[in-house]
Every structure is written in C-alpha cells, then in structure tokens.
C-alpha cells in the first residue's frame, strides 16, 4: 500500500512488472495505486481498502457538544508535508493543533508556535485520547493510497480536512470532508468548520457512518470474495 513514488525508490518499473507475473493477484488499498499498476500493463490487480477496528476506535461521549475551542489533530508521516502544516498552524493562532510527529525530527518547524502541542511516539491508547479530544483530522498529503490515519480518524468521528490527492476519495467524500489543494484552502476550511458547529457536527456524523464501510468484518468479506 505504498504510494508509487515510494515503490519506484525501491524497484524499477521492469522489476515491478516481472514480480507481478509470479502472483495470482495483487491487492491494493486504493484505486490510484491500481491505476498506476494498470498503466504499467499489470492487470491482475484487486482494489481493496484499509480496514479499521471500529470496536476500539470509537468517538468520545461528547463528540457533538465538546466544550471549548475547536481542536485539530495531525497524524501520520508517510508523504506528509510538514512544512506546509507548520505554515497552516502559524496562520491559525486561535486553533489548537496536536501534531503527532512520531519519530520525525520536525520540532524546529513549530518553534514558537504556542498553539501546537507536539506528540512523540506514544502508545495507541494515548493516541486515541488525543483523537477523542479533537474535532478535525488535518491531512496535508503529497499522495495517499489507503491510510490507517484516515480510517481511524473517521471511526472516532472527526471531520476530515484533506489534500485532494491519490486515493483519498475512495475513503472520503464531500459529506464528511473538505478537500484542499493549497495552504489557503486548508486555512479557509478549518476556519469555516471552527465557526459553524452545525456543519462541523454534520461532517463528524458522516465520518462515523462512512467508517462502518471500512470495518474489519467488511474487509474480510472483501477478501473472501477474491478467494472464491
């Protein structure tokens, strides 16, 4: 479920084509990777999706009436644009951001930004706590195939503000997400949601609904149909 750029760093297109001949089927987690492989002349490709454990990733009890200011969480490192994220944070001093950086060395980008809390590599339960204390999942991406971050964000009922790249529309649509193509788009959409709680709650509700499509049970059904 690597983006094409990551695949091409490791393998030549000739190697990818050759390897595809030794398997019955290649399973991808997003249509953009399927299209990439099809364009290489590889036809034995099945498009599935990234699953989520809806029993563990659940919304907070006060999802629709969280007190205080709107909070935004940023998670994931693969094909993320942290410089652009830092710019967005700097332009929205009234919004608090949880920046889940994992092991990425990006602290210098957020130096002096008092509205950013940098979160290192933490246990899953602690990460879920930050998700449940947030309203919006911000995903500034250069590309994406299938994303654990996207699916868990939706399962915890977060409104999605995302780059319109890769396979993102396999997972989100206009009912639960704001699609962006520039830093100003991200800033504008976060401000719209921060100032319109009714719209924010509508996106949250639809994220929860859409997350059910990506449950482990549905993933098993998807794969079992492939094996028949």
Predicted regions located by residue number:
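Conserved acidic donor-binding segment of nucleotide-sugar-dependent glycosyltransferases
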Residues: 174-184, 192-198
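Short glycine-rich donor-binding/catalytic loop of glycosyltransferases
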Residues: 142, 158, 162-169, 182
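A short, well-ordered alpha-helix in the C-terminal region of glycosyltransferases
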Residues: 192, 199-213, 222-225
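Acidic donor-binding loop of glycosyltransferase active sites
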Residues: 132-145, 158
């Amino acid at each position: 479920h690597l983006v094409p750029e990551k695949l091409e760093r490791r393998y030549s297109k000739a190697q990818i084509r050759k390897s595809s001949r030794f398997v019955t089927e290649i399973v991808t987690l997003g249509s953009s990777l399927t299209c990439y492989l099809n364009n290489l002349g590889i036809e034995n490709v099945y498009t599935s999706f990234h699953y989520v454990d809806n029993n563990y990733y659940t919304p907070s009890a006060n999802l629709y009436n969280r007190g205080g200011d709107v909070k935004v969480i940023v998670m994931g490192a693969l094909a993320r644009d942290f410089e652009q994220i830092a710019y967005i944070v700097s332009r929205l001093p009234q919004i608090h951001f949880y920046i889940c950086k994992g092991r990425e060395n990006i602290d210098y980008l957020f130096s002096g930004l008092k509205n950013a809390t940098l979160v290192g590599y933490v246990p899953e339960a602690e990460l879920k706590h930050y998700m449940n204390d947030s309203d919006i999942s911000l995903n500034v991406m250069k590309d994406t195939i299938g994303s654990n971050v996207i699916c868990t964000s939706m399962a915890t009922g977060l409104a999605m503000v995302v780059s319109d790249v890769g396979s993102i529309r396999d997972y989100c649509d206009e009912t639960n997400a704001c699609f962006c193509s520039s830093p100003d788009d991200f800033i504008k959409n976060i401000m719209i949601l921060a100032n319109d709680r009714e719209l924010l709650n509508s996106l949250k509700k639809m994220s929860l609904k859409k997350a059910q499509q990506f449950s482990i049970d549905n993933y098993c059904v998807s794969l079992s149909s492939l094996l028949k």
